[in-house]
From Swiss-Prot:
It comes from Salmonella typhimurium (strain LT2 / SGSC1412 / ATCC 700720). Catalyzes the complicated ring closure reaction between the two acyclic compounds 1-deoxy-D-xylulose-5-phosphate (DXP) and 3-amino-2-oxopropyl phosphate (1-amino-acetone-3-phosphate or AAP) to form pyridoxine 5'-phosphate (PNP) and inorganic phosphate. It is an enzyme of class 2 (transferase). Pfam families: PdxJ. This is Pyridoxine 5'-phosphate synthase. The lineage of its organism: Bacteria, Pseudomonadati, Pseudomonadota, Gammaproteobacteria, Enterobacterales. The gene is pdxJ. 3-amino-2-oxopropyl phosphate binds at N9, R20, G194, G215, H216.
Length: 243
């Protein structure tokens, strides 16, 4: 069984920063801490509306990361140009709707083969490895192999959102079957979306999995497990100011 890697998505550090229009918390600092804690890579989604990660974040992260940068992005001319200029180690192509809270589903690779083939070729020519964010669907997996993507990232949202054990088991079986097919076609398999401390183990146990990209759950846990130290430090500074 191959080594399983963790890509930490730091988008929500930027979400918190942008909520008040400040320069903190700094996604670059968060990336450094994540790397020190064992992250194998850092994932950021540069959305068209720049709601969290910014172009500046992407440039600085590319220059400062000690691990690998995975840039999630829509398949648009603007984003392709940014990727070719920035040259992250990986690009994960995702569908994007401006009104969505987070990415809601996988790419329709089968329905836009030429567009995906061109994007994969353009990124590969810049030395960037490409993954396609797709549902655990046989048609989409076959299409991903056809358009020349070396990686897929299986959308685990339906698994994560399953309301019963039976539903979750059904979704897990779909993901396992999809991963087996992808590996048979020569694709490397990543997964992500909605993975938490409570549901990650079953996905991590699948032998075909190469990397899991997880963000919201990690940042949410960090708010709690790091909160004691943050509160104590603030109180110390306040008392220090009073002499």
């Amino acid at each position: 069984m191959a080594e399983l890697l963790l890509g930490v998505n730091i988008d929500h550090i930027a979400t918190l920063r942008n909520a008040r229009g400040t320069d903190y918390p700094d996604p670059v600092q968060a990336a450094f801490i994540a790397e020190q804690a064992g992250a194998d890579g850092i994932t950021v989604h540069l959305r068209e509306d720049r709601r969290h990660i910014t172009d500046r974040d992407v440039r600085i992260l590319r220059q400062t990361l000690h691990t690998r940068m995975n840039l999630e992005m829509a398949v648009t001319e603007e984003m392709l140009a940014i990727a070719v200029e920035t040259r992250p180690h990986f690009c994960c192509l995702v569908p994007e709707k401006r009104q969505e809270v987070t990415t809601e589903g996988g790419l329709d690779v089968a329905g836009q083969r030429d567009k995906m083939r061109d994007a994969c070729a353009r990124l590969a020519a810049a030395g960037i490895q490409v993954s396609l964010f797709i549902d655990a669907d046989e048609t989409q997996i076959n299409a991903a192999a056809e358009v020349g993507a070396p990686f897929i990232e299986i959308h685990t949202g339906c698994y994560a959102n399953a309301e019963t054990d039976a539903e979750q088991a059904k979704e897990l079986a779909r993901i396992a079957s999809a991963a087996t097919l992808a590996a048979r076609l020569g694709l490397k398999v990543n997964a992500g979306h909605g993975l938490t401390y409570h549901n990650v183990k079953a996905i991590a146990a699948l032998p075909e999995m190469h990397e899991l990209n997880i963000g919201h759950a990690i940042i949410g846990r960090a708010v709690m497990t790091g909160l004691k130290e943050a509160v104590a430090e603030m109180k110390r500074l306040m008392l220090e100011a009073r002499g």
